[in-house]
Amino acid sequence: MARKTPIERYRNIGISAHIDAGKTTTTERILFYTGVNHKIGEVHDGAATMDWMEQEQERGITITSAATTAFWKGMGNNYPEHRINIIDTPGHVDFTIEVERSMRVLDGACMVYCAVGGVQPQSETVWRQANKYKVPRLAFVNKMDRTGANFFKVYDQLKLRLKANPVPVVVPIGAEENFKGVVDLLKMKAIIWDEASQGTKFDYVDIPAELADTCQEWREKMVEAAAEASEDLMNKYLEEGDLPEADIVKALRDRTIACEIQPMLCGTAFKNKGVQRMLDAVIDFLPSPVDIPPVKGELESGEAAERQASDEEKFSSLAFKIMTDPFVGQLIFFRVYSGVVNSGDTLLNSTKGKKERLGRILQMHANQREEIKEVRAGDIAAAVGLKEATTGDTLCDPAHPIVLERMVFPEPVISQAVEPKTKADQEKMGLALNRLAQEDPSFRVQTDEESGQTIISGMGELHLEILVDRMKREFGVEATVGKPQVAYRETIRSTAKDVDGKFVKQSGGRGQYGHAVITLEPNEQGKGYEFFDEIKGGVIPREYIPAVDKGIQDTLKSGVLAGFPVVDVKVHLTFGSYHDVDSNENAFRMAGSMAFKEAMRRANPVVLEPMMAVEVETPEDYMGNVMGDLSGRRGIVQGMEDMVGGGKIVRAEVPLSEMFGYSTSLRSLTQGRATYTMEFKHYAEAPKNVADAIISAKSK
């Protein structure tokens, strides 16, 4: 089967934005204009084609990035047919993992901003991620019909907040309810869309007189930006005072792909204006798979290698998303970087070192699907029948193994206990949690050995809430979620010398007799428990000494203050006595345990709490609020530094118990413009008032 669309005409793009910037509506319009779905789905009534999980439709936010293929010949049929693969990315901070994951497989991105709200918090996070993966991008200012819409204000915010270099290629005609269309600065013509045909037809008309000066000014800025692409162009521009359209497009394209500039457009997806011109810009300015550097990887020998985006190259692809589909089971979304693969071929999962047969290949359109026989370099598709693959795995030709760069996923920051509501839910819950953890690498499941509870951990409170919700909807498991819990520990601060432990039972016949004397002292942090046998002259027979050690180890599981595990102590067994007839292992275990409990009471026991290393990235204006709040949470600020592209990073150590509800309060403190990460650092002694509260809570 030959290739339908030459790879130069592929555009793999992501559409990403802050919640409510109108991203889903924008994607919907793209699908409508590219002729894929003929009735437009509106988010307002929960019918958008891309948002296909039930919760998304209820919450009106996009959670999972669905991948869709569309075709475009240009607004006025002025291009050969291009193939656009769109990855829809979520705009909520608790789903940053999804955004990060889709950035990895994109060639370009279209950032959607609200003409009223401008650059919002998540936009900053997404922008940083796009910088990290060097993704070329366009900016689309949506909702130009809303009260308070201001295209030029958003232009200023892009420069100021994101340190971006936006280059408008259109300017709006009117704003708010008077928004009519846009002026195309390349053609210097106004574009007015026909409302009756939902924007599928349009006319080029003369620029309204009142906009002539504005358009001239912005055209000059655009041509200057193009001229900076090369010395030759700059000289041509200086000589002639202008540049031909073809030169401008090529120069802006080169600079966009080099991440030096971001072409900027505007419109209102809801009113069918501007998205069509933005699609043309995707073709004009965003890269095809051959315009960006070849994907890098590692061979079995550990050598670095590259794979060119070509059908002739050996097959390599990356699995970037797993979804459970109610009809076909598990779908693995993958991006083909090089080569060709057919359904039925055997692939090597080089990340895990396992071979698997590729079953069916599906081309996804939001939630409809078309079965295809092969995929080629540049394609994004979904595979059915791969059992082993998880997010971030490389799937490649077994004869030519390569591991593409691995994705790095953040550690979860919040944990909660989940309990099934009924016995019947018990087994299903284990299955459901494992399936969800497979789909989402930032979600972990473990069993707490101390309490026997199942503990789930994730990226934020909303993240866990949605996973528990999915468990109920997709797997029919009802579960109750506990309050987030903290794992405390106990240790000692001083030494207790020569403490006796004597276990004696004489009750006629054979009795029990064990006697051990120990010295207990603090150990270095992180060293755990150590036992030293210092018995001289056989006062305790050799065979009973391990029993004393075992008795102490049993007692370590539950300390004397509040029953938390005891850490970092040294025990010296120094003396004892025995009875020829009555002594046995059990008696010495009991003696060891009694001696340890008594010694611990005397050795100034304390409660330890987990301390977290917290990093907050915040705009400078909110710095004071953030620092004040961290100190209020018993945090110790350890340092600050400037962020590349504005803003500050605050590093602090904060007790885990004080961090519950933090993502919510940080959001309100900084109007959602700050993000934070936290990971476990070490255990530290809890202040007396805190320790007392913990002990009394535990004893209830």
From Swiss-Prot:
Q: Which GO terms describe its molecular function?
A: GTP binding; GTPase activity; guanosine tetraphosphate binding; translation elongation factor activity
Gene3D superfamilies in UniProt:
3.30.230.10, 3.30.70.240, Elongation Factor G (Translational Gtpase), domain 3 (3.30.70.870), P-loop containing nucleotide triphosphate hydrolases (3.40.50.300), Translation factors (2.40.30.10)
One GO biological process this protein is involved in is: ribosome disassembly
Q: Which SMART domains match?
A: EFG_C (SM00838), EFG_IV (SM00889)
Instruction: For this UniProt record, give its keywords in alphabetical order, as a comma-separated list.
Output: Cytoplasm, Elongation factor, GTP-binding, Nucleotide-binding, Protein biosynthesis
Q: Which SUPFAM superfamilies match?
A: EF-G C-terminal domain-like, P-loop containing nucleoside triphosphate hydrolases, Ribosomal protein S5 domain 2-like, Translation proteins
UniProt keyword Protein biosynthesis present: yes
Subcellular location as annotated: Cytoplasm
Name the InterPro entries for this protein: EFG_II, EFG_III, EFG_III/V, EFG_IV, EFG_V, EFG_V-like, EFTu-like_2, G_TR_CS
According to the entry, every stretch annotated as the tr-type G domain falls at: 8-290
Q: State any GO CC term.
A: cytoplasm
Positions that bind GTP: 17-24, 88-92, 142-145
The family annotation for this protein states: Belongs to the TRAFAC class translation factor GTPase superfamily. Classic translation factor GTPase family. EF-G/EF-2 subfamily.
Question: PANTHER family attached here?
Answer: RIBOSOME-RELEASING FACTOR 2, MITOCHONDRIAL (PTHR43261:SF1), TRANSLATION ELONGATION FACTOR G-RELATED (PTHR43261)
The free-text function statement in the UniProt record for this protein reads:
Catalyzes the GTP-dependent ribosomal translocation step during translation elongation. During this step, the ribosome changes from the pre-translocational (PRE) to the post-translocational (POST) state as the newly formed A-site-bound peptidyl-tRNA and P-site-bound deacylated tRNA move to the P and E sites, respectively. Catalyzes the coordinated movement of the two tRNA molecules, the mRNA and conformational changes in the ribosome.
Write down what this protein is called. Answer: Elongation factor G 2
